[in-house]
């Protein structure tokens, strides 16, 4: 994959944002945490787009969302000093997650924040590739594209992996697992940190 063909999704308008959200819905359809939050397929398809929009709003606004030129992969970054929209995220959780899981889901998000660096850093909030196009280097290309920005600025990076199958990809790009989080019936979640380069 030619990483020079990536561009910021936010600068091309609402149609590109909608396409990015749809790509993420397809990409996370088998993700352990996403499917723990929305177990039933119809509920996942109905509610996940709103969740991803809330998680990505600040990234889109900051022009820090990248997609592959074909739109099959998406990475949503938060630059240093740009915060996510916690209020919108909390509202989405309250309105879309079954009541029995809301406290655990909120606790998962809160605990992932505990491991974020206190120094200015880039935060990879979501990265996903459509299922039929995985294992072709798309995710790695998106990751490398974002990490080049981190390296140009000499900034660390943070993410949390919701799927243990993806931790090796992140490790190959310099991330280290710093903890394992599990709340109630949640699957394990792995906060990961990449030092300044």
Which residues make up each language-model segment?
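Active-site rim helix/loop that mediates acceptor-substrate recognition in acyltransferases
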Residues: 41-64
């Amino acid at each position: 994959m030619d990483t020079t063909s990536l561009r910021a999704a936010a600068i091309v308008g609402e149609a590109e944002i909608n396409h990015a959200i749809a790509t993420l819905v397809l990409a996370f359809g088998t993700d352990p945490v996403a499917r723990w939050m929305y177990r039933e397929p119809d509920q996942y398809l109905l509610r996940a787009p709103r969740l991803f929009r809330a998680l990505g709003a600040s990234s889109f606004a900051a022009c820090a969302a990248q997609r592959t030129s074909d739109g099959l992969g998406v990475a949503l970054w938060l630059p240093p000093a740009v915060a996510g929209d916690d209020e919108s995220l909390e509202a989405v959780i309250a309105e879309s997650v079954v009541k029995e899981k809301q406290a655990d889901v909120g606790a998962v998000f809160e605990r992932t924040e505990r491991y974020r660096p206190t120094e200015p850093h880039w935060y990879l909030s979501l990265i996903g590739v459509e299922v039929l196009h995985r294992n072709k280097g798309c995710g790695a290309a998106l990751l490398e594209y974002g990490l080049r920005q981190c390296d140009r600025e000499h900034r660390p990076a943070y993410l949390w992996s919701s799927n243990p199958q993806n931790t090796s990809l992140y490790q190959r790009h310099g991330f280290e697992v710093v903890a394992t989080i599990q709340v109630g019936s949640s699957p394990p979640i792995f906060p990961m940190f990449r030092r300044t380069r």
